[in-house]
């Protein structure tokens, strides 16, 4: 053991350890290089393409998935490594890159290369067939955000609404539940929550699980504010827990931004905002609305304060669409 060694013996031991560590690193680098040399495709994040293990490698073909989530500087990392053909896949009608700094965001860092190229008029190809949503759930986003170009790759029979929730129309598995509660601002004034909506979300999930037509891992709970995500997480943890083997095991509670690219059989969306001034905050970003209402496969349940939400034109259009089809779940308001 090193502590028992003295003088020259200790120095020699340190030298041997250093030599062995260098040899281990050399062997690891050799094995990694061998794997990379034999690989026809290398998968990495945009920033990961700048790792030292890839610094001498060229990528003549770059395929960037979720390209609208990548900032322009990060997109350049793989492109400058010998790219001759660039394929960008993404949806500029959904959320842009996440930028923490407001100053950087206002300076344009939240604009993706994908969005810039579209704005410049570069020819693009749109994949128009969606395989996720019940056809009814596709209707509004297609009309509002995609010029009515979306088509369905699944039928209503393949996306039956789950039992356990009294849908206003069983042929239209979408429901808007008016909630009269008020939003709360956290102590730091940086996030918001809504206890009335959170309590209703818990009741809705309990009812869905009680019928056995869906399991907890098939349900996604979504909110626009981290304050509401924390409140919901606390409620479900206190009610039994979300770990494996617990009553809500597998239930995911995330922000809208955290659900981009994800899907669940049922999405329960708590909109949080409820105030006399009609302020909706960053719910006013139509891309956030688009992401939230396009995650569900079999059913979508939205909770919110209609008077507040109608101050925003996109939310007003969405609520009008739901109301015209009789999808306001007034029977759930007082439960």
Residue ranges and their predicted role:
Residues 47-335:
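Conserved helicase motor core of SF1/SF2 NTP-dependent helicases
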Residues 1-61, 74:
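Conserved helicase NTPase catalytic core signature
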């Amino acid at each position: 053991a090193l502590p028992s060694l003295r003088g020259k013996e200790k120095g020699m031991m340190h030298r041997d350890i250093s030599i062995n560590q260098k040899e281990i690193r050399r062997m690891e680098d050799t094995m990694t290089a061998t794997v990379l040399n034999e690989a026809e495709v290398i998968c990495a994040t945009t920033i990961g393409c700048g790792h030292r293990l890839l610094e001498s490698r060229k990528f003549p073909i770059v395929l960037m998935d979720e390209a609208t989530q990548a900032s322009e500087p990060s997109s350049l990392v793989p492109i400058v490594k010998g790219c001759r053909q660039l394929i960008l896949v993404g949806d500029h009608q959904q959320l842009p890159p996440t930028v923490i700094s407001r100053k950087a965001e206002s300076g344009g860092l939240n604009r993706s290369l994908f969005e810039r190229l579209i704005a410049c008029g570069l020819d693009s190809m749109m994949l128009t067939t969606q395989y996720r949503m019940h056809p009814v759930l596709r209707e509004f986003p297609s009309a509002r955000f995609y010029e009515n170009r979306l088509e369905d790759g699944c039928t209503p029979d393949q996306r039956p609404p789950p039992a356990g929730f009294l849908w206003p129309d069983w042929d239209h598995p979408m429901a808007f539940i008016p909630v009269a509660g008020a939003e709360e601002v956290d102590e730091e004034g940086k996030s918001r929550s809504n206890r009335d909506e959170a309590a209703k979300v818990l009741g809705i999930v309990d009812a869905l699980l009680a019928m056995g037509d869906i399991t907890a891992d098939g349900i996604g709970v979504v909110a626009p504010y981290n304050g509401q995500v924390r409140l919901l997480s606390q409620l479900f943890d206190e009610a039994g827990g979300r770990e494996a083997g617990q009553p809500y095991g597998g239930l995911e509670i995330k922000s809208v931004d955290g659900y981009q690219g994800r899907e669940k059989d049922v999405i329960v969306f708590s909109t949080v905002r409820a105030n006399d001034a009609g302020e909706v905050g960053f719910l006013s970003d139509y891309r956030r609305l688009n992401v939230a209402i396009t995650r569900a496969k079999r059913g979508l349940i939205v909770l919110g304060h209609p008077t507040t939400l109608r101050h925003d034109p996109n939310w007003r259009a969405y609520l009008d669409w739901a109301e015209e089809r009789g999808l306001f779940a007034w029977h759930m308001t007082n439960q």
